[in-house]
Amino acid sequence: MKHLTPANAKAKQFTEAAAEGRQDEVVAMNSMVGCTTSFDPGWEIDAFGDSMMVGAVPALKYYFPGIQIDARSNRHWSDGEAAVERAGDTLRRAVVLSFGTNAGIDEATVTAVLDRIGPDRMVVLVTIHIDEPRTRADNTLLRRVAKERANVEVADWDAAVRSRPDQLQPDGIHPSLDGAHLYASTIRAA
């Protein structure tokens, strides 16, 4: 078993507090070291996604303490539609949607999901990054749909990671540990 130095123990404590959404503890630890960075309140965010999001869960919890994440591998936009439907009126103020890696993006389904969420919540659509001909068309569709709605923004994961392929696992699709932070910060920047 690895022995923790006092500094490593504090870092571990901070990481666990952030991952578990203990916002007050994170803020207190930040202020003890003179850090004034504040994260968006994760308790106001629901996130739904596929394997891209699964790989980024710890980073998302770090950047958005308290975020509610519903992510599973091999999900499609139709699964996102069902998840949003199940959440119903309990959806939080902001919603992140990250689907399309496995089966492409169908405009009717994306529109149905956004209609269900409604115009009163902020929504972030995450672009896909895969080495397939459909990638450009799918991402163009997401950008176009977002432009048509005042409450929808795009987190351009494809552009962010295309310039940083070292942030991907060997499969060239899923984020590495460092890539998970790039994924989360791309969402945060949207």
Where is each model-derived feature located?
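A short helix->loop->beta-strand "cap" motif at the edges of active sites that frequently abuts
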Residues: P119-M122
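A generic structural signal for well-ordered alpha-helical segments
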Residues: L60, I117, V145-K147
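Catalytic His-Asp segment of secreted/periplasmic serine-dependent ester chemistry enzymes
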Residues: T135-A190
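N-terminal secretory targeting modules
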Residues: M1-D46
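Hydrophobic/aromatic beta-strand patches that form the interior of the parallel beta-sheet core
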Residues: D46-F48, V124, E153-A155
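Conserved SGNH/GDSL esterase-like catalytic core that processes O-acyl groups on lipids
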Residues: S38-A112, I130-A137
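A broadly tuned preference for mixed-charge, low-complexity surface segments
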Residues: R93-R116, E148-V152, H174-T186
